[in-house]
Amino acid sequence: MIFYFSGVGNSKWVAHKLADALHDKVLPIAEEIRKEAVYTPMKGERVGFVFPVYGWEPPKIVLDFIRKMQMQASDYLYFVCTCGDDTGKTNRIFTQAIEKKGVFNTHPL
């Protein structure tokens, strides 16, 4: 499953290209954040996040969604961010938000 947020469409395009290549489903964060869903990845299923970098960090809606979401553990989590030239503190901020959920093991690159 690939969760995405897109402001002008770039991240949406990336999410759909990834989903096509990985035979995965795409879930828009702007819609999913309104739901009270529990996400249960199947064994070995990847969980991805795609979003733009806003001010050298993930957009507020992405961090709010991570805090709100209920998810069972996943073996593999990744994120892809779109940006002009610099991701700033995005990796650190996103990783900290995910680690607080306690359901993902993060491995820095």
Could you describe each region identified by the protein language model?
Residues 2, 7-109:
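FMN-binding flavodoxin-like domain, especially the glycine-rich phosphate-binding loop
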